[in-house]
């Protein structure tokens, strides 16, 4: 599992990868974001890693680079015919994601448990 990351905590639950970005969505180095996104995308290509849940419970804000990184991971999973979603966003984050129409592409679940269950449902 990916344990050396600074921005994301990565967990695997059955065939679902749960990533939890932590801290300030603008308080990171671009190189770290790019490197970690690529590491997670590589992990998602491995057998047994099909679905993706992005847990936003620790985020209050993120900038365009961060959104782009999340979208690249979500899109890759969806393009392979697997499930991807968001969960646990606060009211401010929900507004940002709704304004960007991202929920038309990937659903949002109120709790992490709901998201993991939905992702794993065949």
Residue positions per predicted region:
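Amphipathic alpha-helical interaction surfaces in cytosolic regulatory modules
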Residues: 25-106
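Short acidic-hydrophobic, aromatic-tinged amphipathic segments that line or gate anion-handling sites
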Residues: 105-115
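A short, charged, amphipathic alpha-helix used as a generic interaction element across diverse proteins
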Residues: 115-122
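General structural signal for secondary-structure boundaries
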Residues: 11, 63-65, 114
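STAS-typified acidic loop motif
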Residues: 2-39
């Amino acid at each position: 599992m990916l344990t050396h990351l600074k921005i994301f905590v990565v967990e695997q639950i059955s065939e679902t990868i749960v990533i939890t970005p932590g801290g300030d969505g603008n308080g990171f180095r671009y190189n770290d974001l790019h490197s970690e996104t690529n590491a997670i995308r590589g992990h998602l290509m491995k057998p047994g890693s099909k679905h993706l849940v992005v847990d936003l419970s620790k985020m209050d804000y993120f900038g365009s680079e961060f959104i782009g990184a999340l979208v690249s991971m979500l899109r890759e999973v969806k393009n392979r015919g697997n499930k991807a979603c968001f969960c646990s966003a606060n009211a401010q984050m929900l507004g940002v994601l709704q304004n960007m129409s991202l929920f038309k592409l990937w659903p949002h679940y109120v709790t992490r448990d709901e998201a993991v269950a939905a992702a794993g449902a065949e």
